[in-house]
Regions:
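Peripheral terminal and linker regions in Fe-S/redox and tRNA-modifying enzymes
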Residues: 1-228
């Protein structure tokens, strides 16, 4: 069909369609929810789409996304088209990095927060969106990495779980010439080594960096991890 030969559809399948224990006939589909926010109307449309595909329930993910557990493989083109037609007002297919970097709610909402973590994530997303053209293998590698292995916390409480992913940012305010400004540390390396799980350690010598430098350092680290 026309949609099956579409480059955007192929990119979406590569990043959002996941295997299940039922083999090739049944897939799971991940909806990438910007900032983890859906309106009531959007949520109803997601539920209707899941029901149309044969899923009687959906799962909420730790990444603030939604998983449709069961979608028959032949329905994937129709599922994608309905996403575009019925939920085109929200980027559930990860067209941009904006809104798809996991953060805490940040200082604009949290009473003990120090930095506006979502705003920092938007700065990082803007850089990443400019870095590679869409629909390339390299871009897909970066999408997968950012979707699951990057988190930002607006203070040392680490509400996003940033020490437990491969690239994490922990923010901390600093007094610079009498003005309070957001800084942060870049952490990386969480994983399993010789069967033993471990958290990330401080990168870049553990130094606190201002936001712009922090974003640049994070992009460079992601390029290394994604082998770009």
């Amino acid at each position: 069909t026309r949609i099956e030969g579409d480059a955007a559809f192929a990119r979406w399948k590569a990043i959002a369609v996941l295997p299940t224990r039922f083999g090739e006939a049944v897939k799971s589909v991940r909806l990438f929810v910007p900032y983890g926010h859906l309106t009531a109307a959007q949520l109803r449309r997601v539920a209707q789409l899941a029901e149309w595909a044969g899923s009687l329930f959906v799962r909420l993910m730790a990444t603030q996304d939604v998983l449709i557990p069961f979608v028959p493989e032949p329905l994937l083109p129709g599922f994608y088209m309905r996403l575009q037609e019925e939920l085109g007002d929200v980027d559930l297919t990860f067209r941009s990095f904006k809104g798809h970097i996991v953060t805490c709610v940040g200082a604009t909402v949290c009473k003990i927060g120090m930095a506006d973590a979502p705003a920092l994530a938007d700065k990082l997303a803007e850089k990443l969106d400019l870095f590679l053209p869409a629909d390339t293998a390299q871009k897909l590698a970066l999408l997968r990495l950012v979707a699951d292995e990057v988190r930002i916390s607006g203070c040392p409480n680490a509400c996003s779980g940033h020490p437990a992913v491969r690239v994490g940012i922990g923010c901390l305010n600093q007094n610079v010439a009498g003005e309070v400004r957001p800084f942060g540390r870049l952490l990386y390396g969480a994983g399993v080594t010789d069967g033993v799980p471990h958290l990330s350690t401080e990168g870049e010598g553990g130094k606190l960096m201002p936001v712009d430098a922090l974003v640049d350092a994070t992009v460079e680290r992601l390029k290394v991890l994604a082998e770009l």
